[in-house]
UniProtKB/Swiss-Prot annotation:
HAMAP family: AIRS. It comes from Aeromonas salmonicida (strain A449). It catalyses: 2-formamido-N(1)-(5-O-phospho-beta-D-ribosyl)acetamidine + ATP = 5-amino-1-(5-phospho-beta-D-ribosyl)imidazole + ADP + phosphate + H(+). The gene is purM. InterPro entries: PurM-like_C_dom (IPR010918), PurM-like_C_sf (IPR036676), PurM-like_N (IPR016188), PurM-like_N_sf (IPR036921), PurM_cligase (IPR004733). Pathway: Purine metabolism; IMP biosynthesis via de novo pathway; 5-amino-1-(5-phospho-D-ribosyl)imidazole from N(2)-formyl-N(1)-(5-phospho-D-ribosyl)glycinamide: step 2/2. This is Phosphoribosylformylglycinamidine cyclo-ligase. It comes from the Bacteria. Its EC number is 6.3.3.1. GO terms for cellular component: cytosol. Belongs to the AIR synthase family.
Length: 345
């Protein structure tokens, strides 16, 4: 290098102009998700949001998550427009477990080389997820980091804040013997278990474009995570909800006990639903044990709700009216020390 050589940030692999072009592309996305509590627009150093009116003792609830290695499959198949929905879903579905209404969302998009079209597709999906959950997309970070990611590979993370009345926090403490359990159907594997999914695809040498029911294997795997916010918030207003469990990483065995008091167990009726075809395919193609399936995947159940048995029919009617595929999946029973907290029979 001579003394006359002048290097720029772009020479180092960071294109500020591309970043600015992306911001212009996504301004409309943010605007469509706006809530009245949000002050200001995109571009500030921080995003401002008021607590909604009507809360006496508001408690903020926060959560952060990613999409895991589902992204690898999406990138390989050049399907970028739905992983943003997955990202929002993984965060907001966790918030409603405590009974919280999501308020605002921020995203982090990191890549080795920024492709504006790809990033815009991802953020547009984030906007769709925010609209589905009534959550404002108030900002984010786009990081172009040459040398950190291979080519145009990218990773995304989300952060969400919601609010709940202190006296209405759902923490599982009211769960008791005889409570009914309701399942809300999942749209597919959602955003968990994809390292195993990809291993099964590798070992079985399966064609991801093969037919699977009325769709393809690829489409079934990449179907965006269902967002349960609006129907569940409506249910919380109409029924006495004792607990909610978002069936994510760890499946049934890990997630249901997170909301159960000691000396209680969830008894799941395996005959109450049929696994969607994608899970049967995964089990067969990977020779995966039943226990491992329930530990890794949601097996068609995205959320489980515990409530008094006398409110079961009312809740099912409401959920179905809201467009959810909901069914009676089991009940809560007493358990003695040392007993499993989840029984699937």
């Amino acid at each position: 290098m001579t003394d006359k050589t002048s290097l720029s940030y772009k020479d180092a692999g960071v294109d500020i102009d591309a970043g600015n072009a992306l911001v212009e592309r996504i301004k409309g996305v943010s605007k469509r998700t706006r809530r009245p509590e949000v002050l200001g627009g995109l571009g500030g150093f921080g995003a401002l949001c008021q607590i909604p009116a009507g809360y006496k003792e508001p408690v903020l609830v926060s959560g952060t998550d990613g999409v895991g290695t589902k992204l690898r499959l999406a990138i390989d198949l050049k399907k970028h427009d739905t992983v943003g929905i997955d990202l929002v879903a993984m965060c907001v579905n966790d918030l409603i477990v405590q009974g919280a209404e999501p308020l605002f969302f921020l995203d982090y998009y990191a890549t080795g080389k920024l492709d504006v079209d790809t990033a815009a597709a991802v953020v547009t999906g984030i906007g769709v997820g925010c609209e589905q959950s009534g959550c404002a997309l108030v900002g984010g970070e786009t990081a172009e980091m040459p040398g950190m990611y291979e080519g145009e590979d990218y990773d995304i993370a989300g952060f969400c804040v919601g609010v709940v009345e202190k006296s209405e926090i759902i923490d599982g403490s009211k769960v008791g013997d005889g409570d009914a359990l309701i399942a809300l159907a999942a749209s597919g594997p959602h955003s968990n278990g994809f390292s195993l999914v990809r291993k099964i695809l590798e070992v079985s040498k399966a064609d991801v474009h093969q037919p699977l029911g009325d769709t393809t294997l690829a489409s079934a795997l990449l179907e965006p995570t269902r967002i349960y916010v609006k129907p569940v918030l409506k249910l919380i207003k109409e029924c006495e909800i004792h607990a909610l469990s978002h069936i994510t990483g760890g499946g049934f065995w890990e997630n249901i006990p997170r909301v159960l008091p000691a000396n209680t167990q969830a008894v799941i009726d395996e005959q109450s639903w049929q696994w969607p075809a994608v899970f049967s395919w995964l089990q067969q193609a990977g020779n995966v044990t039943r226990h491992e399936m329930y530990r890794t995947f949601n097996c068609g159940v995205g959320m489980i709700i515990a409530l008094p048995a006398d409110q079961l029919e009312k809740a099912l009617t409401l959920l179905k009216a809201e467009g959810e595929n909901a069914w009676h999946i089991g009940h809560i029973a007493k358990a003695v020390d040392g007993e499993e907290q989840v029984i699937i029979q």
